[in-house]
Amino acid sequence: MVTPDKDFAQLVTDHIFMYKPNSFGGGYETWGIPEVQKKFEVERPEQVIDFLGMMGDSSDNIPGLPGVGEKTAKKFINQFGSMEGLLSNTDQLKGKMKEKVEANAELGRLSKELARIMLDVPVTFDAKDFELDHPDVEKVKQIFQDLEFRRLTDNFLKHFLESRRTLRHQRGNKE
């Protein structure tokens, strides 16, 4: 995955990595499981969902639990493992924090759901839906010339003609 969005860290596995572009260009960071564990102080990447649910994320309109910021969320993940673990063990909290967490349990559950990237959406895939029609070469050529894309015009024509020959050959239609 190539994204600057920390939410996607929840999807990192042994076989799925996150390539996080650096701000203002200039390379990227590669996040595997160890990097996610270190950044969020979690045991498993899927705990990022709980972490974000606890502390909230204003850029994604996730409210989080009132009074819980990054440090407290890391502490709670370490101590309770999940939002559910936190909410079922509020007796271990003290003072105002206990009151806030108990009073906002539903908000915490909602925040966790808002932080979860849904993977069980129905997706149908038919490769034919992605086949491109042949472009109107003359129209494309005219647009490129109007925009003075000389090299792009030459490259387009060269690659288009090559790919058309290859496609015809693969289909056994040697015109």
Task: Report residues per predicted region.
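Low-complexity, acidic/Ser/Thr- and charged residue-rich accessory regions of DNA metabolism proteins
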Residues: 103, 113-165, 174-175
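Low-complexity, intrinsically disordered or signal/transmembrane-proximal segments
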Residues: 169-170
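Extended two-metal-dependent nuclease catalytic cores across DNA- and RNA-processing enzymes
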Residues: 1-124
